[in-house]
Amino acid sequence: MSGIDAKKIRTRHIHEAKANGTKISVLTSYDAMTAAIFDEAGIDMLLVGDSAANVVLGRETTLSITLDEMIVLAKAVTIAAKRALVIVDLPFGTYEVSEQQAVESAVRVMRETGAAAVKIEGGVEMASTIRRIVDAGIPVCGHIGFTPQSEHALGGPVVQGRGSGADKLLADAHAVQAAGAFAVVLEMVPAEIATEVTNQLDIATIGIGAGNGTDGQVLVWQDAFGFNRGRKPRFVREYATLGDQLLEAARAYADEVGSGAFPGEVESY
């Protein structure tokens, strides 16, 4: 098993991984069963992402998921994850109004879920908010590049940091670090720029569609393991085809129930 060598991963282990060049594995998780499996597999961090709005609740965007919904999901993950560090997204509308709102939302997540950190989107414009949360004793993971909560303002899911956008991305990265974040997600960023950001920062960078030069990688598990049978982003590599397997299994079950083959003597009392 590769990755961080620790019985219980904490933010200090993420800093150590950055310093010694150990790659950091991250997957999303939204329930106890997948959290237990990913934890046993040695995944270093589990992200209870607002992507649950899409892959769990079936909504078109992440914007409608609430803090209450995120907390329910995060509770399940933290119950099952014994080793992995659990991060919870602060959803849209729970931290942008004021720094006080952000702190209150983060405090609620930590108190009610048992998570180790929260994640918020934004760079320079969110630096003071990150600082306030960190000053409240709560670890923060930043998120820059393409930020899904701002997809309408950004014109949809498009690569960030090209051309003159590289300077903004670097400024965002340094602002997030200076604000006290322990790590930062780089989403849909040219590999060369993501590598440059990684080389300049002292905190860990976690890439998603950002090439191989970041300190770690994160994917939505339904994409990575083929549970989502629809169109996937270019940056996804499928490690399994669980959606097709589940479809065939469900068909087999329906057929056996219909034919009377299930339950049989073995499954009966």
From Swiss-Prot:
- State the EC number(s): 2.1.2.11
Q: Which GO terms of type biological process are on file?
A: pantothenate biosynthetic process
Does the record's keyword annotation contain Transferase? yes
The kind of enzyme this is, by top-level EC class, is transferase
Residues the record lists as binding Mg(2+): 50, 89, 121
Question: Which Cys residues form disulphide pairs?
Answer: none
Its recorded reaction(s) are:
3-methyl-2-oxobutanoate + (6R)-5,10-methylene-5,6,7,8-tetrahydrofolate + H2O = 2-dehydropantoate + (6S)-5,6,7,8-tetrahydrofolate
Pathway assigned in UniProt: Cofactor biosynthesis; (R)-pantothenate biosynthesis; (R)-pantoate from 3-methyl-2-oxobutanoate: step 1/2
A cellular component term from Gene Ontology for this protein is:
cytoplasm
Function of this protein?
Catalyzes the reversible reaction in which hydroxymethyl group from 5,10-methylenetetrahydrofolate is transferred onto alpha-ketoisovalerate to form ketopantoate.
Name of the protein this chain belongs to: 3-methyl-2-oxobutanoate hydroxymethyltransferase
